[in-house]
Each structure stands twice: as C-alpha cells, then as structure tokens.
C-alpha cells in the first residue's frame, strides 16, 4: 500500500482523505520512506523537515475527522525550492554563504499554500540563486534526473522536478525566470507551469520575467497548485487579479483535441536540436493530429537566445560574481563564465534588450500564433546530459559545436519568459536511451487556462506521465 500511496496524485489524495480510505499520516510516512530511499541517488533535497511533516500530518488527520470543509490541497505533502523563503525553515538560495540562514517570513506563494493546509516535506536543491540551467552548486553538489542518476536534472528547479518524478510528493513549488521550471520538468519527465506575467506574485519583482509556479506529475495537479496561489498582491507591481477562469476546470476539459489549432515550431529559430528530440517532436505532432488537432508548422524570428541573455542578464551575473568573490565564496564555473562575458556588454546593448528586445520577441510570438490556439515546441533542444566535470557534456549536437549545454538548455524557454507568455512543459516521450523529452505549450498573454486545457488533453491522450523511473 505504501508504494501505491507515494505515486498518488494530489487530486487522488484529496479524494481518498475525504472518503476516509487513507490518512495524511499514512501518506506522509510513505513519502518520507520513499525520500529516504531515493534521495541518495538523485540528491534532490537540501533540508528535510520530517518531524515537522509528521506533526502536520497528525494535525491534518484530526481536522479531516472533524468533517469540516477543507481546501482541495489540504493534507497534500509537497516540497519547496530553496529559493522561496520558508519561515522557521532553513533557506540557502543554493549558496554556501547562506547555509545556515533561517528566514522569519514566508514567500508569498508558499504563504498561500500553507493557508491551503499543504504539508512541507523539505526544501529542494537549486544552483546559486537560481542562476543556472543545471542544478549544481558548491553547497549541495549535483542533482540528477531520476531516469539516470549521474545525468543532470536541469535547473534551476532541478531538485523540485526530480523529487516529484521520484515519488517524493505529488507536487512541488518552483520558480522560473527563463525556463527554471520547464527545463527540469522536461529533463525529469514532469509537468511544469510558467504562468503569464503577474499571475503568481513574488515580492519586490523587478523585471516581470521571473515567476513562481508549480511542478507536478499531472497537469491537473499543477493546475490545482496554480489556482491556489494566483492573484494580486501589493508587494508585486506586476501582479494581476485572479483569473475569471478556473485552471482546475480547464485541466478537466473533457474530450480529445478536436477543434484545437496548434502552431508548431521545431527550434524557435535557434537552429540547434538533438536528432532524438526532433524525432520525438515529430511523433508528438502526429499524436496531436490523431487526437483531432489541426497542426501547422510555422517559423519564428527571434534574437539569438544566448546573446540576448548576455545583454539582458549579464550585468546581474557580473554584480553577483563580484559580491561573492568579495565575500570569499568560490563561484560555480558556469556562473563565472557568464560574468566574464558580461564584461564586454555595453550599456547600449542592455538598454536595447530592455526597451526593444522584449517587445520584438512578444510581437514575433503573436505573429507565429496567428490563427492558432497554442504554439508548441520542444521544451529543451537536448535530453538530459552528464554532469559537468571530467565526463562533462559534449559540445556537439547533431554535428554542431554549441555553447556549454548547461547554458544552451534554456534556448527554447527563455523567449516566452521575455514575452511574459504562459507556457507549460508536459512529458512528450522518451529518447533511445530512455531519457524523457518535454513538449512546451505556449499561449497568448494571460490565456493560461487555454494552455492548461490543451496540455491536459494531450497528456491524457498520450499517457507518458504514467511511467515511473526504476530507482
């Protein structure tokens, strides 16, 4: 029974709780046993709050017995990325300098989830301040995809995605500024939602690209977490009121994809795509057609992702690197590399990226989606790859020499973030080596419910999410 419990979805757990067929105490114990078994293989956790989780589970059990009307996520165990502040629980930001930091207040999203009665299992790994597309740091080491320990889980929400797919909680809380939810969801075989700009608030939001969001094994579970955390907050100048549409109802849209118009793009003009990813994406398009969708391949003209990233974010990396060095903290090599490149970026280039670049990207997506309900792409140009180091990732993809894969991996997910658009990664198959590949569904600004509806119907039609790694 315990093995069955840790694979249950959040939706299923809620139904079992209310039918008095299982208790939060049983579920939390099963998930903690699973965590103890798999974490040495994937290294997804920074902090485990086992005692606290057991206490919360007992309290939840008592409230469920009382028969009171409780939120849908009540009693569901979950993890939180270690960039989100958790009052009274260590929050390291993936940085050795904050190894013992314990915040006094909760991040907005986590505070809203606590109000729903979720149970905290612990904090998941992230690179230093979430600044990389892989989850590796001096503090925690490297996090692996559950499908092949030793291969990267992606980043920066790598621990969150790896935990969910390994059976450590049905849902997780992550964040995404350029793919940090969607990339690890792709490399680990999870569902990850990057909401439209302003949907989920974060305090002191400075650019609108970054947002918190859910990771889960099903679109429905991710929609449940999204719905519980969305809505305006005065601490975020980009935040918007709650959607008039229910994300949960969108995920429960009945039927197949009949009538859905899909625009499809293989590489978003970035011209680098692993042959296995190309093959699986072609098959996914055929699956959509078989499910009733109309699919039309489109082109899109976007700036070079790596170059635009340097212009938009390079100064932040340079400033961070200088602060860490001044404090005697050794930098992870890829962060140092981006900081070094940033030294050659001019003020004019930074200004152009902010003033014109984002609008040009937004307009390019709008043109590509003319006459379509959603745009679909591969989530990542390559599947999971070996951890950096002596046996690091190849710099050849389909015969092309490319930048380090830990930087290239966000080339398909950065542009929708700069445009502020909703995007979701769902499992889209497995390559010849058994590694998962994600599909990215992108929608129009604030059309989050439409994206969720299409992604949920695709997921039900294919069933890739029903496979579990053999850990």
Per-range role (PLM):
Residues 31, 53, 222, 262, ...:
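Residue-level signal for inorganic ion chemistry
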Residues 191-283, 462-471:
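A short helix-breaking turn/cap at a secondary-structure junction
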Residues 21-29, 58, 246-250, 275-299, ...:
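Acyltransferase
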Residues 1-55, 65, 290-292, 467-471:
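An N-terminal boundary/leader segment
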Residues 73-93, 253-265, 314-366, 379-382, ...:
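Short helix-loop capping/hinge segments that flank enzyme active sites or metal/cofactor-binding pockets
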């Amino acid at each position: 029974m315990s093995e069955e419990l840790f694979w249950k979805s959040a939706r299923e757990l809620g139904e079992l709780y209310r039918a008095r067929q299982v208790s939060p105490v049983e579920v939390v114990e099963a998930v903690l046993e699973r965590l103890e078994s798999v974490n040495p293989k994937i290294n997804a956790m920074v902090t485990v709050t086992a005692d606290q989780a057991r206490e919360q589970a007992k309290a939840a059990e008592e409230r469920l017995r009382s028969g009171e009307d409780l939120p849908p996520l009540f009693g569901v165990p979950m993890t939180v990325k270690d960039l989100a502040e958790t009052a009274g629980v260590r929050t390291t930001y993936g940085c050795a300098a904050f190894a013992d930091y314990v915040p006094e207040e909760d991040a907005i999203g986590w505070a809203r989830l606590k109000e729903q009665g979720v149970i905290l299992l612990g904090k998941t790994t992230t690179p230093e301040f979430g600044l990389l597309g892989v989850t590796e740091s001096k503090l925690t080491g490297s996090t692996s995809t559950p499908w092949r320990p030793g291969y990267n889980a992606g980043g920066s929400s790598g621990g969150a995605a790896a935990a969910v797919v390994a059976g450590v909680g049905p849902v997780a809380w992550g964040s995404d500024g350029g793919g940090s939810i969607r990339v690890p969801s792709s490399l680990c075989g999870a569902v990850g939602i990057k909401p439209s700009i302003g949907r989920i608030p974060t305090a002191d939001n400075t650019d609108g690209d970054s947002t918190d969001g859910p990771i889960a094994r099903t679109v429905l579970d991710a929609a449940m977490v999204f719905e519980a955390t969305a809505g305006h907050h005065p601490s975020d100048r980009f935040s918007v009121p709650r959607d008039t549409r229910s994300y949960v109802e969108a995920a429960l849209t009945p039927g197949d994809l009949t009538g859905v118009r899909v625009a499809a793009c293989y590489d978003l003009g970035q011209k680098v795509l692993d042959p296995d990813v190309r093959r699986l994406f072609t098959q996914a398009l055929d699956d959509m057609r078989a499910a009733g969708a109309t699919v039309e391949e489109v082109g899109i003209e976007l700036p070079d992702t790596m170059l635009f990233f340097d212009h938009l974010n390079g100064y932040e990396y340079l400033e961070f690197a200088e602060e860490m060095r001044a404090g005697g903290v050794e930098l992870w090599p890829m962060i140092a590399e981006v900081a070094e490149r940033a030294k050659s970026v001019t003020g004019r280039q930074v200004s152009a990226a902010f003033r014109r670049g984002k609008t040009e990207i937004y307009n390019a997506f709008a043109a590509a989606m003319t006459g379509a309900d959603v745009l679909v792409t591969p989530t990542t140009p390559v599947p999971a790859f070996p951890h950096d180091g002596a046996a690091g990732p190849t710099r050849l993809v389909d015969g092309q020499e490319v930048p380090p894969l830990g930087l290239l991996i966000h080339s398909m997910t950065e542009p929708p973030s700069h445009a502020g658009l909703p995007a979701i990664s769902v499992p889209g198959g497995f390559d010849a080596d058994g590694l998962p590949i994600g599909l990215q569904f992108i929608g129009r600004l604030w059309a989050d419910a439409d994206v969720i509806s299409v992604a949920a119907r695709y997921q039900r039609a294919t069933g890739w999410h029903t496979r579990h790694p053999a850990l």
